[in-house]
Curated annotation (Swiss-Prot):
Protein's name according to its UniProt entry: Small ribosomal subunit protein uS14
Lineage of source species: Bacteria, Thermotogati, Thermotogota, Thermotogae, Petrotogales
Cofactor(s) annotated in UniProt: Zn(2+)
Pfam family, one: Ribosomal_S14
Keyword presence, Ribonucleoprotein: yes
């Protein structure tokens, strides 16, 4: 779980747009965040397997 201070800090609008970075909406993780869903890879996988993300299915080949 991410530190509360860093999560709150990321919610503020920065002075410069380039300082902005994406965080997971669920857990606040700063790395491996999918822009389209706003989720990190771990939360994305959990929600996709539960069927909470429409149009996403597990690949098999």
């Amino acid at each position: 779980m991410a530190k509360k201070a860093l999560i709150e800090k990321s919610k503020r609008t920065p002075k410069y747009k380039t300082r902005e970075y994406s965080r997971c909406k669920v857990c606040g993780r700063p790395r491996a965040v999918y822009r389209e869903f706003g989720l990190c890879r771990i939360c994305f996988r959990e929600q996709a397997l539960e069927g909470k993300l429409p149009g996403v299915k597990k690949a098999s080949w």
